[in-house]
């Protein structure tokens, strides 16, 4: 075993000491499961398909229950070579559950053969499994028996094949040339026609004829290429069907064709307002695979850039929410403030919206001279501006009347639908990953987590974001005053790009540098996982390495996906005007939903 392999192996854990493993074995027997050792930081348990629902129900009813289905997706295992000790599987499905009371997770996995891809739907236990199962079916082909509406979600209705299978082409050049004939165009248009009967909706009752209205996919209040079909009785929303996927670019498939290093720019585009925030979970997950511990200076720099982008995103969210309610002026103020943030970001990284600046083992380069003055000027400017936003718009009686009590829900509903971020904290649940599960040194910062009073409505959600802005300014102040000295890269063989000085010794070091930069670093075969508190909720990367220069499987869990699935539950019985306010209060962009 090399030193590098030994360092990586020390991070691999089976979590047999986790109390939930004992609880499961006491209930189902010591031989009922296969526990997988990974670097996810989470117990990973392979469950028999026949026991899946029983195990899920058991976990949900424990004294300190696993109350949230955080993620659900699949993997094509057929080409995976490093599977020692795991159940035989052509495909697998994983279920990631969170216990808020324990502040712990568990991941259940089910092995499937290519000839039998059926398993029971999880929607009977967790309603938010609906969209996750639809996406897993269309990407891999697993059939979830009992699912209420197992149809395509991200891909067009006419699409054939399952794109995340290993035998499905990954590049446009592997397909035949695209041709849009008149017949194909007519077929695509017909496929987009909404048929209420397909969704269990009635066109009329004895006394009422319902109207069906398309909002989007090109509408300013839909905040992107997003379509929602409304079933209306007058102006009252009887039901609705969100239609997503117009922004889907195959981000997870791209992860299988890019090196660990060259995939970093793609992470910026997942939630395109978040910039470096998007890079954080990816590089942390890769560093777990590699066994890299970064210097303190790197941690603080990463936190500083993340909080700058958090403020930038929140400013746009707050101002566009106010605009959706009917006031235009704050948007122009917000863009002035965001320009100041971009000036700081550009001076540090060289780019503005999508810096692609974090690196495996560090950051691209050290902080430039004068960065502290730019940040100081911004910190002197921003608090007064926040006060003006609050005084001029957010305390406005019309805005309060339009948003308070609108699209309201409690803690149980938020957990049932996988809500995170301000949407969850507005219900009174104090769960911010920066505090609950600190990463990148957040445990060293002094800041508060704003929490609501028990009900998450449009007004509470936006006001929590205002207070989050103030807390981000506190964190930035501490970054400015306590920036550590030291290197901006870890001294580790898998740090990418490696330190340039090593290339100047002899031909061997030059070759090593060349291979790592051109082909990319080779990560140890294992699995890793990292969640962070992103701008819109919890974002996570679940990476599987098969000992190659590229990821075997890249799973990206975004908060906006879960939040849009919840829309029908939140707005049934509301007016169309209330829906517009609710869409503005969610804080989403479609790239974050569709990936």
Swiss-Prot record:
GO cellular component entries: NADH dehydrogenase complex; plasma membrane
Q: Where is this region: NADH dehydrogenase I subunit D?
A: 209-595
**PROSITE patterns, alphabetically?**
COMPLEX1_49K
Q: Which reaction does it catalyse?
A: a quinone + NADH + 5 H(+)(in) = a quinol + NAD(+) + 4 H(+)(out)
Could you tell me where this protein is found in the cell? Cell inner membrane
Primary location: membrane
Gene Ontology terms for molecular function: NAD binding; NADH dehydrogenase (ubiquinone) activity; NADH:ubiquinone reductase (non-electrogenic) activity; quinone binding
EC number, as in UniProt: 7.1.1.-
- Region of interest (NADH dehydrogenase I subunit C), ranges: 1-185
Which keywords label this protein?
Cell inner membrane, Cell membrane, Membrane, Multifunctional enzyme, NAD, Quinone, Translocase, Transport, Ubiquinone
Q: How does it sit in the membrane?
A: Peripheral membrane protein
Give a yes or no for keyword Transport in this entry. Answer: yes
Q: What class of enzyme is it?
A: translocase
Tell me how this protein assembles.
NDH-1 is composed of 13 different subunits. Subunits NuoB, CD, E, F, and G constitute the peripheral sector of the complex.
- Record family assignment: In the N-terminal section; belongs to the complex I 30 kDa subunit family. In the C-terminal section; belongs to the complex I 49 kDa subunit family.
Described by its record, this protein's role is as follows: NDH-1 shuttles electrons from NADH, via FMN and iron-sulfur (Fe-S) centers, to quinones in the respiratory chain. The immediate electron acceptor for the enzyme in this species is believed to be ubiquinone. Couples the redox reaction to proton translocation (for every two electrons transferred, four hydrogen ions are translocated across the cytoplasmic membrane), and thus conserves the redox energy in a proton gradient.
What's the name of the protein?
NADH-quinone oxidoreductase subunit C/D
Gene for this protein?
nuoC
């Amino acid at each position: 075993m090399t030193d590098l392999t030994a360092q990586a192996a020390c991070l691999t854990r089976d979590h047999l000491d986790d109390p939930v493993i004992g609880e499961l074995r006491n209930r189902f027997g010591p031989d009922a499961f296969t526990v997988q050792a990974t670097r996810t930081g989470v117990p990973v348990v392979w469950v028999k398909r026949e026991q899946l629902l029983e195990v899920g129900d058991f976990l949900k009813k424990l004294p300190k229950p696993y109350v949230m289905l955080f993620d659900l997706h699949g993997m094509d295992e057929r080409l995976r070579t490093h599977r020692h000790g795991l159940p035989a599987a052509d495909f697998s499905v994983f279920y990631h559950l969170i216990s808020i009371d324990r502040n712990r997770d568990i991941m259940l996995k089910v092995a499937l053969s290519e000839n039998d891809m059926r398993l029971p739907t999880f929607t009977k236990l967790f309603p938010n499994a609906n969209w996750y199962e639809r996406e897993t079916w269309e990407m891999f082909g697993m059939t979830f028996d009992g699912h209420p509406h197992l149809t395509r979600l991200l891909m067009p209705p006419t699409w054939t094949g399952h794109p995340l299978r290993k035998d499905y082409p990954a590049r446009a050049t592997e397909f035949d040339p695209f041709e849009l004939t008149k017949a194909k165009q007519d077929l695509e248009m017909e496929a987009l026609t909404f048929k209420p009967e397909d969704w269990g909706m009635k066109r009329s009752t004895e006394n009422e004829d319902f109207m069906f209205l398309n909002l989007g996919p090109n509408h300013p209040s839909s905040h992107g290429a997003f379509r929602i079909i409304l079933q209306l009785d007058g102006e009252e929303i009887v039901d609705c069907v969100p239609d997503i996927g117009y922004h889907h670019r195959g981000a997870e498939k791209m992860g299988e064709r890019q090196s660990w290093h060259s995939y970093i720019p793609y992470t910026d585009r997942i939630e395109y307002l978040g910039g470096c925030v998007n890079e954080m979970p990816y590089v942390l997950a890769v560093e777990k695979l590699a066994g890299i511990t970064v210097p303190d200076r790197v941690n603080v720099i990463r936190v500083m850039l993340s909080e700058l982008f958090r403020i930038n995103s929140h400013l746009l969210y707050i101002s566009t929410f106010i605009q959706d309610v009917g006031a235009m002026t704050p948007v122009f103020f917000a863009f002035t403030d965001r320009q100041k943030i971009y000036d700081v970001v550009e001076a540090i990284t060289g780019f503005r919206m999508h810096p692609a600046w974090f690196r495996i083992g560090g950051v691209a380069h050290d902080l430039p001279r004068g960065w502290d003055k730019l940040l100081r000027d911004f910190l002197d400017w921003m608090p007064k501006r926040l006060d003006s936003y609050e005084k001029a718009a957010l305390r406005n009686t019309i805005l309060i009347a339009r948003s308070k009590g609108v699209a309201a829900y409690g803690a149980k509903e938020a957990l049932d639908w996988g809500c995170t971020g301000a949407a969850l904290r507005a219900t009174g649940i104090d769960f911010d990953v920066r505090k609950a599960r600190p990463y990148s040194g957040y445990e060293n910062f002094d800041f508060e987590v704003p929490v609501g009073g028990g009900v998450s409505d449009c007004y509470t959600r936006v006001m929590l974001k205002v207070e989050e802005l103030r807390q981000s300014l506190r964190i930035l102040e501490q970054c400015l005053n306590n920036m550590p000295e030291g290197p901006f890269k870890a001294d580790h063989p898998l740090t990418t790009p490696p330190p340039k000085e090593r290339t100047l010794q002899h031909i061997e070091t030059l070759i090593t540098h060349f291979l790592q930069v051109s082909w990319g670093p080779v990560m140890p075969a294992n699995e890793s996982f990292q969640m962070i508190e992103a701008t819109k909720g919890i974002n996570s990367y679940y990476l599987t390495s098969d000992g190659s220069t590229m990821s075997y499987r890249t799973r990206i869990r975004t908060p906006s996906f879960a939040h849009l699935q919840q829309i029908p539950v939140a707005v049934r019985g509301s007016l169309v005007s209330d829906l517009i306010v609710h869409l503005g209060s969610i804080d989403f962009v479609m790239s974050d939903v569709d990936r």
